Amino acid sequence: MRLSQMLFVTLREDPAEAEIPSHKLLLRAGYIRRVGSGIYAYLPLMWRVLQKVSQIVREEMDAAGAQECLLPQIQPAELWQESGRWDTYTQAEGIMFALQDRQDRELGLGPTHEEVITAVARDMIRSYRQLPLNLYQIQTKFRDEIRPRFGLMRGREFIMKDAYSFSTDEADLKIIYSKMHDAYCNILQRSGLAYRAVDADSGAIGGSGSQEFMVLAEAGEDEVLYTDDGKYAANVEKAVSRPADAQPSSFKSVEKKETPKTDTIAKLCDCLQCSPTQVVKTVLYEAVYDNGQTLLALVSLRGDQSVNEVKLQNELVQLGDVVKGKALIALTVAEGGTKWASQPLPLGYIAPDLADSYIQKSKQVHGKFVRLVDQTAVDLKNFVTGANEVGIHQVGVNWKTDIPLPKHVVDIRTAQVGDRAVHDPKQTLQTARGIEIGHIFQLGTKYSQALGATYTNEAGKEQPLVMGCYGVGVSRLAQAAVEQSYDKDGIVWPVAIAPYHAIIIIPNGKDSDQVEAAEKLYSELNAAGIETLLDDRTERAGVKFKDADLIGIPYRIVTGRSLKEGNVEMVERATHDAHQIALDQVLPTLKEYLAKAIST
């Protein structure tokens, strides 16, 4: 392609809207253009990158035995209501674009396709002889992000590969899940990216287990905790660990102490001259479900630990039967002046045994607190906790003898850097930032049971299909590659997904020898399958060099002064290494470089 004929506009300054390097560079280099909040046009260079990523994904999915299809983007609300996710996606998380057609039928623009593919399977799969089956598509998805940011990282529409597998049982599902894990590793390796596969929370998708594939980058929105031995890695939302041991308590008997103005752990410990590890703090949460009912949760954990609200949400979803709720719409920490309280709450001084009488009778609010406690608090003896009176704490408290142990003992703490690993206490958790590129789930029968998707087994008995789902953000992967690989001059594309392999620059368009040599190389390289740009614009040489660095093409060939000796300059973008090479050696040299770069 000739740059003089391409839609190609670069910017010298960073756009004000862009926050992270990859977003700035993709805008500056003319890869994308903002059309609206979280909505971007993929320009010619970007589209070539996306096509290459898609092809790698397609090849690996096909190699793993998956079959490509294409599902509708507009989805009937009825399918989502059958699965119980319509309210979650349109109200709780609110990420689905919902609309009505001219016949007042409710529809949604697909953020994901579990319901649609399950409905297709329900209609078409009858027998175990048709299984296992794995279907995938590469398609634009839509999500109504409240605060779109970071360009293609968190947009309102994006390109995604999503696959859905159907099996006869869990053992069969795990075989496909393992194949998808390996396929995702291959996709990221072939794309030239450094990554980690980590244990993850399943979120609104659900299922019994999942893993995320994180491209490592400082600007990543996710925190990954891992051990140096390579045996553990997890998203902080899912991570488990062993915290440091609690310090022995200096309190030997139960006693109330005045602790004025100590509504934080730091103030309390300063007042009582104790360690946060000797404190049991209790946080009061309000959980609102899809049926409008509110459940009040008292959450107790060790004073030096923090609540992992993703883990807490999962626990509260399981407890939703108490109020006949299926999905959690909102989860907030209770504040003073709540309408449901029958009397002022002793916020900052709450104990795990706060009386249910604090809850005013109401049709919308469950009349009893649900009480959860983290194991870190269960292990404490002679601890400090609130006294349910403002300005008062209890010291020397023990479970069961002085205060009832909450019914639900769960893991609801946030694992932290420096914590000991569960699998080996000698290993401590390290941290890295990551960009989630892929997520694979073992769904089980969640959707097949909800939508009535069954098959007949060998014994002639009807059974629910056992499902898995597997997503890769194609457009997100492309931007993540930039976030992981750039320098002060611009983008440094991995060779496998670069829009072009090489760019030929004519420093002086008025020099017929330079033009002739460039034209000849351009024809030879493209004919040999080396995707090559020709910068034949009437711009100064300096502008051409800056643009070449900015757009990040792996190899730059300059038909400059060394032509007199029969040479051209070849520059590797990643290292800026430059050397002179004979004209007739450009093609074999580039072939060698590309083969090596793509194979590693």
Swiss-Prot record:
Subcellular location: Cytoplasm
Enzyme Commission (EC) number: 6.1.1.15
Gene Ontology biological process terms from the UniProt entry: prolyl-tRNA aminoacylation
Catalytic activity: tRNA(Pro) + L-proline + ATP = L-prolyl-tRNA(Pro) + AMP + diphosphate
Domain of life: Bacteria
Annotated keywords: Aminoacyl-tRNA synthetase, ATP-binding, Cytoplasm, Ligase, Nucleotide-binding, Protein biosynthesis
Pfam families named among the record's database cross-references: HGTP_anticodon, tRNA-synt_2b, tRNA_edit
GO molecular function, one term: proline-tRNA ligase activity
SUPFAM superfamilies: Class II aaRS ABD-related, Class II aaRS and biotin synthetases, YbaK/ProRS associated domain
Quaternary organization: Homodimer.
Family recorded in the similarity comment: Belongs to the class-II aminoacyl-tRNA synthetase family. ProS type 1 subfamily.
Domains: entry comment: Consists of three domains: the N-terminal catalytic domain, the editing domain and the C-terminal anticodon-binding domain.
Function description: Catalyzes the attachment of proline to tRNA(Pro) in a two-step reaction: proline is first activated by ATP to form Pro-AMP and then transferred to the acceptor end of tRNA(Pro). As ProRS can inadvertently accommodate and process non-cognate amino acids such as alanine and cysteine, to avoid such errors it has two additional distinct editing activities against alanine. One activity is designated as 'pretransfer' editing and involves the tRNA(Pro)-independent hydrolysis of activated Ala-AMP.
Record's protein name: Proline--tRNA ligase
